[in-house]
Amino acid sequence: MSQYGWDECLYVTRDQVSTVRDGLLNTLEDNLVGVYLHGSLTFGCFNPRRSDIDLLAVTAQSLSLNEKRQLAELLLTYSVPFYPPSVTRPIEISLLHMEQLCPWQSPTPFDFHYSEQHRERYTVELANGEWQHWNDSTSTDPDLAAHITIILTNGICLYGESIDNVFPGVPQADYVASLLSDARGALHYLAANPVYSVLSLCRVAAFMTDGLICSKDSGAIWALD
């Protein structure tokens, strides 16, 4: 099986996701509103050799410094770099609290974000004490409009409140702005990562032309048709 979705995924993938979900619950306890899966695992095009695992978690209140430290330690443990290839996969996750979701804001603020691009920074800052400044400012991410739109379209609730009860509708203009931001990034990395970049651009074109909210793979099929 070269690609699959959540219902058909390998035990090792399901176990990795479940371990992170349980780690979020153990760390955040009553503050955790829900954990949501999106991306290739919900579109049915997860490639165990290439794909990452996309998660989004929502909390009732903003995260404390200690919660952020524990989350960084959790993800440094259970996410893995893209290289060398591994049966466990890289994890990308954003955490937002309810006031960052409602009322809707664009670009969307968030409390915490992890991806393998940040592994070195988190490792260094946990060691040198810089983590104690993680609450000094709030960051925003234009990609969250796209992530939340996809969650509303075909996301999976792994824990907590249902998707419809948590996430507001995303204005189409904000979703388009998020897609265009992704397109600019894809063009920037075209030479270094042509496959990813072309697939990303196909997904953008599918929505801009036909209003299709889809995975990168489905965007490529749309382009071929």
Q: What residue spans do the PLM features occupy?
A:
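Conserved NTP/Mg2+-binding pocket subregion across the NTase superfamily
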Residues: S2-E8, E73-Y189
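Short, solvent-exposed loop/turn segments at secondary-structure junctions
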Residues: T42, Q100-L101, R203-A206
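Extended, basic/helix-rich recognition subdomains
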Residues: Q172-D225
